[in-house]
Amino acid sequence: MALDQNVRLVFDKINDAKKRSPYNQNVELIAATKTRDIFQIQTCFDLGISSIGENRIQEAEKKLKELPSFNSIKKRFIGHLQTNKVNKCLRLFDTIDSVDTLKLAKKINSSSQRPKTECLIEINTSGELQKKGFKPKLSKELISCFSLENLDIVGLMTIGPYTTSEKEIRGSFQALRVFKDQINQELGENKLTELSMGMSNDFELGIEEGSTMVRVGT
């Protein structure tokens, strides 16, 4: 399928899933552009996508320097970030959507040259050992992230379980939604507003369970 047809199909599926969702939320489509070239990214932008997600610093650095609409597209880092690459990541990206340890959060906080760096905290709701992220518990380490003055933590992110079971996938997304509410209650404010749940294979389920961001390969 041609890229433009694929993007339009994804938008249609998002709109249909929103109608099935009881949460009446806005949903941001993040185009996961790994392996896509700058011309394909520009096509996505022209079709109405305003956010892209990259998960490899080196690959992203080459592309983003050449992208004509560099300043108009919101650039999100969505992969596992090593602490030794934080400085470069901050120069390239507007947000870091995969803060998975307190150590990483502190490194971003101390390295940021901005008043605030927008972030999502990654939560491992599936319990799969190969996945990164905090456990869905109100641990001291997790709560400490919210006291870092240079971080603007706006929500949570999770990756659904590697399964064909719709029940298990929904359960993982439901757990993140419930945990967001628990954190807001613990903090005494509605600080967290965003839920990044759903990728190419399960983004419709994510939206039905309240996701406000989906990461879809184009």
Residue ranges and their predicted role:
Residues S211-T218:
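Gly/Pro- and small hydrophobic-enriched strand-loop and loop-to-helix capping segments
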